[in-house]
Amino acid sequence: MNIIITGASRGIGKAIAASFAGKGNHLFLCARNEKVLSDTVAELQVKYPAAVIHARPADLSEKEAAIQFGAWCLQYGIPDILVNNAGEYISGNIIDEAEGNLEKMMAINLFSAYHLTRTLLPQMIGVKPPEGRSRHIFNLCSIASMQAYCNGGGYSISKFALSGFSKNLREELKPHGIKVTSIYPGAVMTDSWSGFDNTGKRIMEAEDIAAMVLAATGLSPQAVAEDIVLRPLLGDL
C-alpha cells in the first residue's frame, strides 16, 4: 500500500512509519528537519528492507509546501492511507501567549492537514482501490481537542479545529467509501514531554499510538473506527 505520513521524523510519526514499514509498504514521509528525516529513513530502511521509503523535507505550515508535497507523492501513485500527524505544541494562555502563537498553531496543526488532504482527495476519490480494500485518512488530534485546559491557548484551539475538520471530512467522504479516523492521544513520551522521567511508565509511548493506527487499518471496508481516544492508564497529567 502507498502510505503518506507527515511529521514522520520522530515521535508518533516515526512510530507509525515503523509499524507500516514492518509490513513492507511503500511509505512517503515528510518533516521539517532534513537531517533528522534522513536519519529516520536510513534507520527504517535497514530495519525493514522490504519497505520502500521515499522522503522529502517540507514545512507543511506553509500552504504551497503542503500542496507541493502532495503533488510529489501523487507522482508515485495514489495514497491508500494518509496520516496527518504534523504538528507542534507551544503552551500559553489566551490572555498572554506570544503574539502570533494562535496563527502559528493553526498553520501547522490544522492548515497543514487541510491543504495536503485537499491536494490528494481528487485522486483518492477518482480512482477506486482494489476489491476488498478502502482508502483511509487519519488525523492526529489530541485530548486537547476534547477538553479545554489552562495553558492550552492557541494549541488547544487549533486541535479543537482539527477535530472539527476531521468530523466534517468523514461525512463528506462516506459516499466515496473513504474512512476518516480521528486519534485523540493523551500524554505520550515525545518531544513535547522532553525532560519528563518516564522510567515508571506513567505516560504512553509513541508505539502505543502507532499500534492503534495499524489496528484500525485492519477492519473490513464496511467498518471504521471513527474516534480513538488513548490515555495513560493512570489518567491525564
What do these predicted ranges mean?
Residues 34-35, 57-68, 99:
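The beta1-alpha1 cofactor-binding region of Rossmann-like NAD(H)/NADP(H)-dependent oxidoreductases
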Residues 117, 158:
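Active-site helix of classical SDR
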Residues 142:
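Residue(s) in the substrate-gating loop at a strand-loop-helix junction
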Residues 93-94, 101-104:
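Substrate-binding pocket helix/loop in short-chain dehydrogenase/reductase
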Residues 9-11:
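Conserved glycine-rich cofactor-binding loop
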Residues 182, 198-237:
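C-terminal helical subdomain
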Residues 23-39:
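Conserved glycine-rich Rossmann-like NAD(P)H-binding loop of the short-chain dehydrogenase/reductase
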